[in-house]
């Protein structure tokens, strides 16, 4: 009965707002399924991407059957998250399942057409079968997790260090065969992607900030976002006070030392050390550790209730939803100027609109501009357009994004 209530409530929460606008990364996922066949994804698209191909291949197969609406694109992530809840129930009971089912960050990413919900499911399945000592399945799911998201490697690494401390050397080998095989299979692609990543870090001014440097701010955000999700509000000091106090309360609940606490800490520690050399310390890249956090905590009704409140605040308030590209595109004409590589949402919602890179030569007297992502590339839109004789005449704001209109000054 308890499990049924948890599953139903968890599903209902995830279905609210599932048709909200896609944001940039989700639009990339959608356009990959439109423009590449399932076999072209690893052979063509993935060479210019920074993720392994398995999620995109799964999504391509899914959309061929279910279509590519916002709801359809996100439904696999919903399903993966529901499987995660059930597996955690098998491992820790209804209380732990409630923590995972209601966790606001897991709710948010279970509504996203990206690979994070999928990799969370694969890793918790691997951990479940590790407990059962069924190593074939451990290797299968750990291997698949690497082919879904490279950052998944930190959990098997943390588990391996834990086993090393336990002097279970043979078991370390037993759980890493599949992961090693996946790394070898994917190595040619990974090498190419690493080269491309280094080039991007050199060419794009602030790209390392997107990836997530190893610093106290990004580390602190992991502990806050793991407990309160993606919601944020002004004034910021009030937000950080409320979210910070809640985070302290939750994390105190898992101070007790058990194997899950140790595995969580070791896995996160490996990720932090790795991020010193290759930036990737963003909280959403570690959400697969939230089920481990829940197992470390055990069933805590008050915490589960708090998680549910934060999740409801998110799903019932559209101000906390993703960037509203859908509404923005409805206001566009036949052409828009922006950083061209960030144009996937425009192409998803209206492929007839021409996306022109704002850094090129502009000859029109009146232009529509989306400044989104310009700062990452070190582009100051006002300086760039002002230097060409343009002046901003109008600005329309949508959720987290804006549309600007610029005209030659002599026409104003």
What are these regions (language model features)?
Residues 411-412:
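Short, solvent-exposed mixed-charge patches
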Residues 1-5:
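N-terminal membrane topogenic signal
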């Amino acid at each position: 009965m308890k499990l049924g209530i948890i599953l139903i409530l968890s599903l209902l929460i995830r279905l609210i707002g599932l048709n909200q606008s896609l944001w940039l990364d989700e639009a990339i996922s959608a356009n990959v399924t439109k423009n590449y066949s399932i076999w072209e994804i690893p052979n063509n698209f993935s060479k210019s991407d920074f993720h392994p191909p398995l999620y995109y291949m799964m999504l391509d197969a899914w959309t061929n059957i279910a279509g590519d609406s916002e709801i359809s694109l996100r439904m696999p992530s919903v399903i993966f998250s529901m499987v995660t809840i059930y597996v955690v129930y098998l491992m820790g009971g209804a209380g732990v399942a409630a923590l995972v089912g209601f966790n606001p960050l897991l709710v948010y990413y279970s509504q996203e057409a990206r690979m994070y919900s999928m990799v969370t499911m694969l890793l918790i399945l691997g951990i479940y079968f590790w407990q059962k000592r069924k190593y074939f399945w451990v290797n299968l799911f750990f291997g698949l997790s690497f082919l879904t998201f490279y950052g998944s490697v930190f959990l098997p690494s943390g588990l391996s260090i834990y086993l090393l401390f336990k002097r279970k050397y043979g078991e370390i080998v037993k759980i890493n065969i599949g992961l090693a095989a996946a790394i070898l299979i994917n190595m040619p692609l990974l090498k190419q992607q690493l080269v491309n990543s280094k080039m991007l870090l050199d060419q794009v001014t602030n790209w390392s900030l997107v990836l997530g440097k190893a610093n106290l701010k990004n580390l602190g955000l992991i502990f806050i976002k793991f407990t309160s999700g993606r919601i944020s509000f002004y004034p910021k000091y009030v937000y950080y006070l409320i979210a910070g106090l809640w985070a302290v309360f939750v994390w105190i609940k898992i101070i007790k030392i058990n194997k899950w606490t140790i595995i969580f800490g070791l896995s996160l520690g490996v990720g932090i050390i790795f991020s010193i050399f290759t930036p990737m310390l963003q909280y959403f890249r570690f959400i697969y550790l939230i089920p481990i956090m829940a197992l470390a905590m055990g069933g805590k009704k008050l915490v589960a209730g708090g998680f549910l409140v934060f999740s409801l605040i998110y799903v019932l308030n559209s101000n906390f939803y993703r960037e509203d590209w859908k509404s923005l595109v409805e206001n566009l004409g036949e052409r828009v100027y922006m950083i061209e590589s960030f144009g996937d949402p425009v192409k998803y919602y209206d492929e007839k609109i021409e996306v022109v890179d704002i850094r090129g030569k502009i000859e029109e007297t009146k232009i529509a501009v989306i400044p989104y992502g310009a700062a990452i590339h070190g582009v100051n839109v006002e300086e760039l357009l002002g230097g060409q004789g343009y002046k901003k005449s109008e600005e329309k704001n949508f959720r987290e994004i804006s549309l600007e209109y610029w005209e030659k000054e002599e026409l104003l």
